[in-house]
Amino acid sequence: MAADGERSPLLSEAGDGGAGGNGLAGPGGSATGPGGGLTPSAPPYGAGKHAPPQAFPPFPEGHPAVLPGEDPPPYSPLTSPDSGSAPMITCRVCQSPINVEGKMHQHVVKCGVCNEATPIKNAPPGKKYVRCPCNCLLICKVTSQRIACPRPYCKRIINLGPVHPGPLSPEPQPMGVRVICGHCKNTFLWTEFTDRTLARCPHCRKVSSIGRRYPRKRCICCFLLGLLLAVTATGLAFGTWKHAQQYGGIYAAWAFVILLAVLCLGRALYWACMKVSHPVQNFS
């Protein structure tokens, strides 16, 4: 039977000298004697240093990667090949370098010197970039013919249509001067070349004077006018002191003149404390 065939290698053969009559030979070479006890016939396998069975080749002995008493090698993190230098681009307005590390997912970056935008990627599908003469970067549709600058001090209309041959426009586009704000130290474009040199910064929305001449002139005028009104109020008070006791309207005249003097002196103080914005380049 199949079961007997599977156990047949374990049966002791008649010619085996190491086994008794009908005993079984165990794996260690011991056999069961007639009395049922185990009789050792050979030393157990593995005693001493014997070669492994012939069916398996011996494994080569080599040195381990880390000896039992040795520390592992130090950890050295892998570094990126381009980690030594940050990616930089040049500003399209002031030509200053701009660090774009960590901003590569954006389409535009802002310059830290002139606060203007510079594109680092192509415009989205169906869009295009347009640079206004005031250096404002605009994005519009590819099919747009005319766009308006959104900056409150510019509001320039830009024609993007095809250029038709013809005479030049008699009214050229006004140019301006880049000015450093006296409040927030940001740079903006000033286009109003008049005697009234007050400008509102588009970044902080505060008013400053372009140069010191205009606020100094207004301060002197207001101070002199306030001083004159103060002297007038003093003389009026001393000259009409007796009449004021009979006519109460004189007190109202005193109060009116004194109020005008205080307003003029306060305005002089306002012009004296006004911040001054300086142009980046000289007027030409």
Swiss-Prot record:
List all Gly residues biased stretches: 15-38
Name of the top EC class for this enzyme = hydrolase
Transmembrane regions: 219-239, 246-266
Provide the positions where the record notes the PTM Phosphoserine. S169
Q: Where is the active site?
A: C140
Catalysed reactions listed for this entry: a 1,2-diacyl-sn-glycero-3-phospho-(1D-myo-inositol-4,5-bisphosphate) + H2O = a 1,2-diacyl-sn-glycero-3-phospho-(1D-myo-inositol-5-phosphate) + phosphate
Q: Which Pfam families match?
A: Tmemb_55A (PF09788)
Q: Where is this motif: CX5R motif?
A: 140-146
Which terms under GO biological process does the entry name? cholesterol metabolic process; lysosome localization; phosphatidylinositol dephosphorylation; positive regulation of TORC1 signaling; proton-transporting V-type ATPase complex assembly; response to sterol depletion
E.C. number, please? 3.1.3.78
Membrane topology of this protein:
Multi-pass membrane protein
Question: Which InterPro entries does the UniProt entry name for this protein?
Answer: PtdIns-P2-Ptase
Q: Where in the cell is it found?
A: Late endosome membrane; Lysosome membrane; Cell membrane; Cytoplasmic vesicle, Phagosome membrane
Q: Per UniProt, which keywords does this protein have? A: Cell membrane, Cytoplasmic vesicle, Endosome, Hydrolase, Lipid metabolism, Lysosome, Membrane, Phosphoprotein, Transmembrane, Transmembrane helix
Q: Where is this region: Disordered?
A: 1-82
Which residue pairs form cystines in this protein?
none
Q: What job does this protein perform?
A: Catalyzes the hydrolysis of phosphatidylinositol-4,5-bisphosphate (PtdIns-4,5-P2) to phosphatidylinositol-4-phosphate (PtdIns-4-P). Does not hydrolyze phosphatidylinositol 3,4,5-trisphosphate, phosphatidylinositol 3,4-bisphosphate, inositol 3,5-bisphosphate, inositol 3,4-bisphosphate, phosphatidylinositol 5-monophosphate, phosphatidylinositol 4-monophosphate and phosphatidylinositol 3-monophosphate. Regulates lysosomal positioning by recruiting JIP4 to lysosomal membranes, thus inducing retrograde transport of lysosomes along microtubules.
UniProt name for this protein = Type 1 phosphatidylinositol 4,5-bisphosphate 4-phosphatase
Q: Which organism is it from?
A: Mus musculus (Mouse)
Lineage, highest ranks first = Eukaryota, Metazoa, Chordata, Craniata, Vertebrata
